[in-house]
């Protein structure tokens, strides 16, 4: 966690506790949302989330979803073999426990109101990965396939979102920034085929970051 992240959480958490001590209980304690993220490392992510608000400004919950590369960045290959084209782009499914820390209303527009929020969490991917390798003859024609799999490598990562939400009655939307500690090649780096470690073909680890949009319903 970087310093900015900790400062934002401390600030909003302090506001939340102060405001909660002076606010009336809300009947809208549950929030469901559909979320879409576009990240660096050429990846997109979609998930569905649920949070239960133990007070108006603190929600506990999580999400389930998947992420995938939309453009391959490094393709393991060698003499007489290459990773099958259907497995060039890295992907995985995940569950994502998280805490939603929401500020009191910071501005209003008609019947709608704006809030700031921070949402720290941990992404837990399926701790298993497999790919098919295409076997080639001297002319580059396919002569068969072999499966390579592993359960080694880091399959989890901490992340956080910082954003702005607009709520009208029970409906709303959010936009903001997301930062993750996920290494999208974390599992594949440990794969070996024909004596060659896949890690040599992938770029150095970079923490993905980008933007997100969410549509939610309160009840």
Predicted regions and their residues:
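Residues that define the transmembrane beta-barrel architecture of outer-membrane proteins
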Residues: 28-32, 42-46, 68, 89-97, ...
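Predominantly the C-terminal beta-signal and adjacent terminal strand-loop region
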Residues: 160-219
